[in-house]
Amino acid sequence: MLAGQLEARDPKEGTHPEDPCPGAGAVTEKTAVAAEVLTEDCNAGEMPPLQQQVIRLHQELGRQKSLWADVHGKLRSHIDALREQNMELREKLRALQLQRWKARKKSAASPHAGQESHTLALEPAFGKMSPLSADEETIPKYIGRKNQSATLLGQFSSSKGDPLCLSSPMSLKIERISSWKTPPQEKRDKSLSRRRQDRRATPTGRPTPCAERRGGV
C-alpha cells in the first residue's frame, strides 16, 4: 500500500527517460502476486481430502494395534497356562519315578517279602502252623517202615497158601496205611524191607508162625 501511494505521488521516480512504456514494472508485480494467490487457493482446496485420508489411515492403524494387542494378550495367557500344566506334569512324573525307585529298592532289600506276606495272609484262614520237631518228623517214618515190613511179611506167608494170613484184618489195615505214602518213600521202604526180610528169613525146616497156628487149630 505504501509503495503504491509513493508511486502515485511521484510518478517521475518510477519512470526512466529512456523507458518506452512507463508503469510496466508495476503491472508485472501485480501479475506475480495474483499468480501466488491463485496457487495458494488451489493448495487450500486440495488439502482437505488428503487430511481426511491421513486421518482414516491413522484410525485404521489404531484399530490394527488394538486387535494385535488383544491377540497378543490371549496368546500370552495361553502360553502361561501351558507352562503351568507342563510344570504340574513334570512334578507328577518325578513323583512316579520316585515311587518306582523306592519299590525297586524295597524289593531288592527284601527278596522274601512276598513269601512272608503270603504266609501272613494264609494264617487267618488255616491258623498258625508251627514247624514239626525232629521227633515228630522221625516217628511217622519209623511207623511207615514198620507197617511196610509187616505187610511184606504177610504177603510172603500168604504166598505159601495160608488162608488165615490172607483174611487177617491187621494186614488189611496195614496195607491201607502203607497205600497213603508217597511213591518215593514207598520205594525206599520196599528196599529197606527187602533187606530186613533177607536178614530175618526163616531157616529151612522151621515152621512159620502162621503154620504153627494152623497146626494148633
UniProtKB/Swiss-Prot annotation:
Which keywords does UniProt give here? Coiled coil, Nucleus, Repressor, Transcription, Transcription regulation
Q: Which residues does UniProt call coiled coil?
A: 69-110
> Basic and acidic residues bias: where?
7-19, 175-192
Location of the protein in the cell? Nucleus
Q: Where is this region: Leucine-zipper?
A: 75-96
Give the start-end ranges of region Disordered: 1-26, 175-217
Its principal location? nucleus
How does this chain assemble?
Self-associates (via leucine zipper). Interacts (via leucine zipper) with ZIPK/DAPK3 (via leucine zipper). Interacts with MAD4.
The entry's function note states: May be involved in transcriptional regulation. Has in vitro transcription inhibition activity.
**PANTHER family to which the protein is assigned, alphabetical:** T COMPLEX PROTEIN 10 (PTHR10331), T-COMPLEX PROTEIN 10A-RELATED (PTHR10331:SF25)
UniProt name for this protein? T-complex protein 10A homolog 1
Instruction: List the source organism.
Output: Pan troglodytes
Taxonomy of origin reads: Eukaryota, Metazoa, Chordata, Craniata, Vertebrata
